[in-house]
């Protein structure tokens, strides 16, 4: 996986947050990989999904991550960290597949980057607000105005396999059609994100040592057909190695 090449510079300009135009992400229901369970949550109660593009050598990524940690409890946000892997020589925590997904979706290759609910992106670590904490709080509290609920069930069948079942019960499909980036050509998909709670890498030059919320896999479970009366599905999946 490691490719010997130059590492792109980190971004430190005070760039304002902008919309991505590629559609939203919502959800956040989760279970430990070795535990079965079922969760039903109203869309209005779902956490803000925050994707962080980072690297173990990225010193200003630490400022971004600490700001998110500081507001995590108050805002209820959930963090998912994608570690740089393409042309990477210093960070062993990423994968080419996960890094490529982030680049294909958002077009960014240099950390730090923070994306809120898939629809608003903040590049760099310099805020144009009073602080990163206040800027991130405002972005995390934006309401997507989706009405209805989502049910997610996870049933492990071995240490590395399991069955994921999902269903959504939107009160009004118009609320989904009105989401940022959604048009008549858009599709709605269910995914399982496999996340390692914390990964240790003492050699990380930004000094953290322990790196939380590491995304290890993004597995497509199936397309949700909004014209169908059955907005549900099930899939057998294999977990990626930690």
Give residue spans per PLM region.
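Conserved glycine-bearing catalytic or ligand-binding loops at nucleotide- and phosphate-handling centers
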Residues: 118, 122-130
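Short, thiol/selenol-centered motifs that function as redox-active sites or metal-ligating centers
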Residues: 53-68, 86-88
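Extracytoplasmic/secreted envelope proteins and their assembly/folding machinery
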Residues: 50, 64-69, 99, 111
């Amino acid at each position: 996986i490691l490719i010997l090449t130059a590492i792109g510079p980190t971004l430190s300009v005070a760039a304002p947050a902008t919309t991505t135009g590629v559609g939203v992400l919502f959800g956040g229901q989760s279970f430990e990989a070795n535990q079965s369970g079922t969760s039903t949550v109203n869309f209005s109660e779902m956490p803000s999904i925050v994707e962080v593009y980072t690297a173990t050598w990225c010193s200003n990524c630490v400022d971004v991550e600490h700001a998110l940690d500081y507001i995590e409890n108050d805002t209820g946000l959930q963090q998912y960290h994608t570690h740089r892997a393409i042309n990477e020589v210093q960070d062993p925590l990423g994968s080419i597949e996960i890094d490529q997904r982030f680049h294909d979706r958002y077009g960014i290759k240099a950390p730090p980057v923070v994306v809120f609910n898939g629809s608003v992106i903040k590049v760099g670590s310099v805020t144009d607000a009073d602080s990163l904490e206040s800027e991130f709080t405002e972005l995390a509290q934006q309401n997507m105005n989706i009405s209805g609920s989502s049910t997610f069930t996870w049933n492990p069948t071995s240490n590395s396999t399991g069955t994921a079942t999902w269903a959504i019960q939107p009160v009004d499909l118009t609320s989904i059609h009105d989401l940022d980036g959604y048009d008549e050509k858009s599709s709605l998909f269910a995914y399982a994100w496999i996340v390692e709670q914390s990964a240790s890498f003492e050699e990380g030059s930004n000094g953290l040592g322990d790196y939380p919320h590491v995304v290890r896999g993004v597995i497509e479970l199936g397309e949700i057909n909004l014209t169908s009366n059955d907005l549900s599905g099930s899939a057998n999946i294999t977990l990626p190695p930690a």
